[in-house]
Regions:
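Cytosolic-side transmembrane helix boundary signature
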Residues: 1-6
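Hydrophobic membrane-insertion alpha-helices, especially the h-region
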Residues: 8-27
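Start-of-helix signal in alpha-solenoid helical-repeat scaffolds, especially tetratricopeptide repeats
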Residues: 24, 31, 69-73, 92, ...
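Internal alpha-helical scaffold/solenoid segments in large eukaryotic proteins
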Residues: 24, 28-35, 52-53, 59-61
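Alpha-helical transmembrane signal-anchor/signal-peptide segments
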Residues: 30-47
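Extracytoplasmic/periplasmic/luminal assembly and interaction segments
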Residues: 42, 53-101
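TPR-repeat structural position
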Residues: 47-48, 88
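TPR/TPR-like alpha-solenoid helical repeat scaffolds
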Residues: 66-82, 106-132
């Protein structure tokens, strides 16, 4: 009887590990795909497509994955570029997308707390300057 229980436990553990690996692989695949879509849109000069791609990549957060950090940097660069060009509305869209992406990826911890703090500071500075409400 003990052997049977041990066999069931081993099978349950193996199945759980396989399911977890499949989940992580699927999430990693979608993360890479969304990042690539963001990069392609960025190269085309498509603001909305780039923001959506990078934002979606961050939503697929996997701890210690460098692509999430690259997506965050790209969104930050898009926001800064628009801010320098005087397009406050687009800058706010990008800063808010970056901030909300990390909030959306919250689970046991909130990832990207440094990005959130930086975005909060920029948003607070830019909202009073926004003309289109």
């Amino acid at each position: 009887m003990t052997e049977r229980i041990a066999g069931i436990v081993v099978n349950a553990v193996v199945i759980s590990v396989i399911c977890l690996l499949l989940f992580l692989a699927g999430t990693w695949w979608r993360l890479q795909d969304q990042f690539a879509l963001g990069e392609e849109a960025f190269r085309r000069g498509d603001f909305s497509g780039a923001v959506a791609g990078y934002e979606s990549a961050i939503h697929m957060y996997i701890p210690f994955n460098g692509t999430v950090e690259q997506s965050a940097r790209q969104l930050w660069n898009i926001a800064e570029t628009n801010e320098r060009q005087g397009d406050i509305t687009r800058a706010l869209i990008a800063y808010r997308a970056l901030r909300s992406s990390f909030y959306a990826a919250r689970w046991l911890v909130t990832p990207g707390t440094d990005w959130i703090a930086r975005c909060d500071a920029r948003i607070a500075a830019l909202v009073p300057l926004q003309k289109d409400r």
